[in-house]
């Protein structure tokens, strides 16, 4: 795992996600679910490794929409604990570079990659997605799920994604945007304070992406469908394995997100864009 010192401005983001004991919490949850932590599979991690709305369902759909193939060089921009990168490597056979600004997430992602036998397919680096340590045209696909909400400078975020994409490259997004009402009910999964959340409307996001050099190939507002699924799931008893295993107050954060969507304070957008 390569370490790149995060910028000072990333401190609020790191504080939102890092607890200092994520690996221990995951090991405890795996053991409680009857798993042998010395012999885990990608299937064992399915319920706890995708830190975004709809979890594995959203990841599968986005990979399919982006038409990721084995020969593609893929960047998982904002990998969290690496669930998306592992699914792409395991299901598509692609080589994946995974970056996140939170060092603890990268440490846990590297551990889990090695644990399920995918360490040789995924290169994890601590890096800022607005200042990527890669040459131009290094990737064929950039995947980013629930990342830009923490980033104020979205022009720089997407300009960097455009810079590292080769001609014909694709940007695949599953993200939260602002709705027509405000403010947000907090906490939500990406923010406990207003200073940590930087939402823009879908229309503004399309404008920013266009200014960065992208054209929309697919754009779908899945807000209500996703909110219905999340409401039904999180109103029931929670399994031993889940994001609540290592994300403090996770159920409260998710139900606030559902409420924000219902009141049009937030929306969920699935998109694939092409390089212009």
Q: Which sequence ranges carry the predicted segments?
A:
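Conserved alpha-helix/loop element of class I SAM-dependent methyltransferases that forms part
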Residues: 52-70
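A short acidic, Gly/Pro-enriched loop at the edge of an enzyme's catalytic core
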Residues: 130-141
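A short SAM/SAH-binding and catalytic strip from SAM-dependent methyltransferases
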Residues: 141-153
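Class I SAM-dependent methyltransferase SAM/SAH-binding core
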Residues: 73-77, 81-131
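N-terminal auxiliary segments of SAM/dcSAM-dependent transferases
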Residues: 1-32
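Conserved Class I S-adenosyl-L-methionine
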Residues: 218-276
């Amino acid at each position: 795992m390569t370490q790149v010192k995060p910028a000072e401005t990333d401190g609020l983001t790191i504080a939102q996600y890092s607890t200092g004991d994520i690996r221990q919490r995951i090991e405890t949850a795996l053991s409680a679910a009857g798993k042998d932590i010395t012999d885990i599979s990608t299937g064992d991690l399915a319920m706890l490794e995708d830190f975004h709305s709809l979890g594995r369902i959203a990841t599968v759909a986005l990979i399919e929409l982006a038409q990721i193939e084995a020969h593609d060089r893929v960047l998982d921009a904002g990998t969290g604990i690496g669930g998306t990168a592992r699914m792409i490597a395991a299901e598509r056979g692609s080589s994946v570079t995974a970056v996140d600004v939170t060092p603890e997430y990268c440490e846990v992602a590297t551990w889990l990659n090695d644990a399920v036998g995918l360490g040789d397919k995924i290169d994890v680096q601590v890096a800022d997605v607005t200042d990527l340590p890669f040459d131009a045209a290094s990737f064929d696909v950039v995947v980013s799920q629930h990342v830009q909400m923490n980033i104020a400078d979205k022009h720089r975020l997407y300009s960097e994604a455009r810079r590292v994409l080769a001609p014909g490259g694709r940007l695949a997004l599953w993200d939260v945007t602002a709705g027509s009402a405000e403010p947000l009910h907090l906490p939500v999964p990406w923010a406990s304070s207003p200073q940590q959340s930087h939402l823009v409307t879908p229309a503004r996001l399309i404008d920013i992406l266009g200014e960065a050099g992208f054209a929309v190939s697919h754009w779908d507002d899945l807000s209500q469908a996703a909110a219905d699924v999340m409401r039904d799931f999180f109103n029931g008893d929670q399994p031993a394995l889940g994001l609540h295993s290592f994300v403090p107050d996770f159920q409260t954060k998710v139900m606030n997100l559902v409420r924000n969507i219902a009141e049009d304070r937030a929306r969920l957008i699935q998109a694939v864009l092409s390089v212009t």
